[in-house]
């Protein structure tokens, strides 16, 4: 039997037929405003409620801002940080020189993937982390897209070896096909894509599981909502996107 990690996101584990297989690295890709950060933060918070320590690697926002964003949903991680069950890795303020005063785990040079991996490894071992989020992994290869797959593979090898189940947030531009970064989809175990589509003059949220190693899963596109308590997915509903006809 494959051990599974429950996302705890209402409706999501049904779509994944029980949860994410343990040690999988999942690419969570989507355009701006699709709910990627909320999804990944909810995954970590739910892990804490199940007694599974977690790590959030902040590359897009200041760790202080991340804590505030999470608290808006009622996910106050500070208590867990004090208890050594949750850790924030600051890979955002690299180069500003302010970080040392606040954060325990800091990445100083984002171009040095070995340093990045060393900081993650230390944090994982310190708190016995079971879940980890990198938000966003795209930042690591934004200036060197040819390195995307290699970087993802290096991270995956280390994190899976440490027994961690990970979500890598991946940014794509509006309307872009694919999952962000050349070849990254081949370097991960799972892909969940979040979309925001205009249907009949209204923006609708939906997600689809493109692949998930070690489990069967729903092959349909399911609608979801972002509420004041986080994301709710509707496994019994299917969203049909209007076909876009391209004229010659």
Swiss-Prot record:
Reply yes or no: does the keyword Nucleotide-binding apply. yes
Keywords carried by this UniProt record: ATP-binding, Nucleotide-binding
Q: What would you give as a GO molecular function for this chain, any one? A: ATP binding
- Listed binding positions for ATP are 30-37
Q: Which residues form the KaiC domain?
A: 3-247
Q: Which CDD domains match?
A: KaiC_arch (cd19486)
Q: Which family does it belong to?
A: Belongs to the UPF0273 family.
Which HAMAP family does the record associate with it?
UPF0273
Q: What is this protein called?
A: UPF0273 protein TK1590
Q: Recite the lineage of the species.
A: Archaea, Methanobacteriati, Methanobacteriota, Thermococci, Thermococcales
């Amino acid at each position: 039997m494959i051990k599974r990690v429950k996302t705890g996101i209402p409706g999501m584990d049904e779509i994944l037929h029980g949860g994410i297989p343990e040690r999988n690295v999942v690419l969570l890709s989507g355009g701006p405003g699709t709910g990627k950060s909320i999804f990944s933060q909810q995954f970590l918070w739910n892990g804490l409620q199940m007694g599974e320590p977690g790590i959030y690697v902040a590359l897009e926002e200041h760790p202080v801002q991340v804590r505030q964003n999470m608290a808006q949903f009622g996910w106050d991680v500070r208590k867990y940080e004090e208890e050594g069950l949750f850790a924030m890795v600051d890979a955002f303020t690299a180069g500003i020189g302010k970080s040392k005063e606040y954060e325990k785990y800091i990445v100083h040079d984002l171009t040095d993937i070995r340093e990045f991996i060393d900081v993650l490894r230390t944090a994982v071992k310190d708190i016995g982390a079971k879940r980890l989020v990198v938000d966003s992994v795209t930042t690591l290869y934004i200036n060197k897209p040819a390195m995307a797959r290699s970087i993802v593979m290096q991270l995956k090898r280390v994190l899976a070896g440490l027994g961690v189940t990970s979500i890598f947030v991946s940014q794509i531009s509006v309307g872009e096909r694919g999952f962000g970064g050349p070849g990254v989809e081949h370097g991960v175990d799972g892909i969940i894509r979040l979309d925001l589509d205009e249907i009949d003059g209204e923006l609708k949220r939906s997600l689809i599981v493109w692949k998930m190693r070690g489990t069967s899963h729903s092959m349909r596109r399911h609608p979801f909502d972002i509420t004041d308590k986080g994301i709710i997915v509707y496994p019994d509903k299917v969203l049909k996107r209007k076909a876009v006809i391209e004229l010659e």
